[in-house]
């Protein structure tokens, strides 16, 4: 039997997932139960779009709860104190020079479960994140991305 996938996460990422799980189990489940009760009061279920919608939402929420529980059960939390501060790892804030666009960009390296590219939180499994892991200030990396190859120079490494 294969081993369950480990989800590399920071303490902050685990906390956010725990909060989402708690919200879904306590607040969202109750809301959906109420929606189902109201929809059932309309009678005939064969053409009851409110009931169908509530049941679909319930299925989605229950699926997300299972997903979150699995991620938390298989979380591998990175202790940022165990990694040298000058080496890029999960939990690092990295300022790089992007040679393609001739600009400085700051990324926060996180586990895949925490990735949020719109807020510059990139996964350690993404091409750029993977390329930065283990590197230090002054290192230049080339990363294959969908548009070709991007070149970055590491300018700063800090901890979140």
Curated annotation (Swiss-Prot):
Entry superkingdom: Bacteria
GO terms, molecular function: DNA binding; RNA polymerase binding
Signal peptide: none
TM spans (from-to): none
A UniProt-annotated Pfam family: GreA_GreB_N
GO process annotations (BP): DNA-templated transcription elongation; regulation of DNA-templated transcription elongation
Stretches assigned to coiled coil: 14-76
Transport is among the record's keywords: no
SUPFAM superfamilies linked to this entry: FKBP-like, GreA transcript cleavage protein, N-terminal domain
Record keyword RNA-binding present: no
PROSITE patterns: GREAB_1 (PS00829), GREAB_2 (PS00830)
UniProt keywords, alphabetically: Coiled coil, DNA-binding, Transcription, Transcription regulation
Cited function: Necessary for efficient RNA polymerase transcription elongation past template-encoded arresting sites. The arresting sites in DNA have the property of trapping a certain fraction of elongating RNA polymerases that pass through, resulting in locked ternary complexes. Cleavage of the nascent transcript by cleavage factors such as GreA or GreB allows the resumption of elongation from the new 3'terminus. GreA releases sequences of 2 to 3 nucleotides.
UniProt family annotation: Belongs to the GreA/GreB family.
NCBIfam families in UniProt: greA, PRK00226.1-2, PRK00226.1-4
The protein, known as: Transcription elongation factor GreA
Gene this protein is translated from: greA
């Amino acid at each position: 039997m294969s081993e369950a996938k480990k989800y590399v996460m920071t303490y902050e990422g685990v906390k956010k997932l725990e909060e989402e799980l708690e919200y879904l189990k306590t607040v969202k489940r109750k809301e959906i139960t109420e929606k189902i009760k109201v929809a059932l009061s309309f009678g005939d279920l064969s053409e009851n779009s409110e009931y169908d919608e509530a049941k679909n939402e319930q299925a989605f929420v229950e699926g997300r709860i299972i997903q979150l529980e699995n991620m938390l059960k298989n979380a591998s939390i990175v202790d940022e104190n165990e990694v040298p501060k000058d080496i890029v790892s999960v939990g690092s804030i990295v300022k790089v020079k992007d040679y393609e666009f001739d600009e400085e960009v700051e990324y926060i390296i996180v586990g895949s479960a925490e990735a949020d590219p719109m807020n510059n939180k990139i996964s350690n499994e993404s091409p750029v994140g993977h390329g930065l892991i283990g590197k230090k200030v002054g290192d230049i990396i080339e990363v294959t991305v969908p548009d070709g190859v991007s070149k970055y120079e590491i300018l700063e490494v800090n901890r979140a």
